[in-house]
Amino acid sequence: MKRLFWALAAALMMFAPAALAQTAQEITDTCTLSAVGKKTLGRMTDGQYQTYWASSSGSYAYVEIEAEESVGGLYVQFYEDIAALEVQTTDDAGAWQTVAVSGGSFLNEYIALDAGAETVRIRPKDGKGRLFIAELHIFGEGDAPDWVQQWEAPLDKADLLALAAHPDDELLFLGGTIPYYAGEMGRKVQVAYLVPTMPYRRLELLDGLWLCGVKNYPMIGHFPDKYQLTLKGMYAQKGWSRESVYRFVAETYRACRPDVVVTQDVNGEYGHGAHRAVADAAQAAIALAADEKYQEKMTHSEPWQVKKLYLHLYEQNPVKMDWRKPLAAFGGQTAFDLASRAFECHISQQRTDYHVEDFGPYDNSKFGLAYSSVGEDVQKDDFFENLE
């Protein structure tokens, strides 16, 4: 009997933390913020990614938070210039001491505080540099809510790479690819873009990817946002040489080592040159990434062989995906539903005429197998056919 008692007691102790865990409540509205540049402090809490607070430099680059209850976590959304942060509280003598440090790798960073305090400040690590913060969310004690993004590093071994020219192209033209494979099927999905566009659009894309079940931070290229109708015209643009685009995509293949790549239309969907370029480079980079001799300015020198490449609207070896199936991982919502909701996260793009559509001329459920080292598809309804 004693043995049974202690076994039950041990089990209760094991599960007690999980049972007692609670979701932290946001307390931002009840906090007082202070900093140099206080006239624009409200921009950090206005819910708008297109506005931001910029600090002074050096010792004045900080935000001080005065809360009415213990602060259990901070969610910082940088506008640009990601900074490693120190979170500080005061000791008994009133001196600032560092209690947590962020990694400084992602635009959105959540910093949990083990020892809650009502007076907290954040500053660049070692007190150097400036801060550019779009939004700051302050939480009481408890676990961060699910909507708070806690990113992991980009994958070094992906199952699938969703490769897009611009933020939102991965939803408009790749449809339910990301929510279906990342969220429902539990595949390791890496997302990459050629064009970073405006800083606020990068925050929008992160919201959309998180909603779709992506946990690994996207890879974002450096190509300027240009518009041309032809592939030749695109490659003639400054910063868009054919060689540099090929190199970036080949480097991406080697970095995340995907088995499957899904990308855009060789005709650029509605004719966009950057869309044409990403489809062109996706094909050319397969051989480059696998070539041991191709080392031109490459950080990742180990060759990688992509097994399958799917292009949007590609007419050869066509594949028709069903994005309308209910997904258990999302409570019965479909991949189409999730892609549509994720596109709504791109608030700055809602004034355009673009919509997530699995019908019409840009049907995002239609793809073609442009390359395969594992044979042609037979079922034609799964990007991982012949890879299981």
Report residues per predicted region.
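Short Gly/Thr/Asp-enriched flexible loops that form oxyanion-binding sites at enzyme active sites
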Residues: Y270-I286
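Active-site rim/loop-helix segments in enzyme catalytic domains that contact anionic ligands
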Residues: D81, E109-I111, A115-A255, Q283-A287, ...
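Positively charged n-region of N-terminal signal peptides that target proteins for export
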Residues: M1-L4
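Extracellular carbohydrate recognition and processing domains
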Residues: Q97-L113
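Disordered, acidic Ser/Thr/Pro-rich linker "stalks" and the adjacent N-terminal cap
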Residues: A19-S70, Y79-L85, T89-D91, W147-Q150
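Bacterial N-terminal signal peptides
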Residues: A7-A16
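The feature marks non-catalytic terminal segments
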Residues: A24, T28-R43, Y49, W151-E152, ...
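Proline-aspartate-enriched helix->loop->beta-strand connector
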Residues: V249-E269
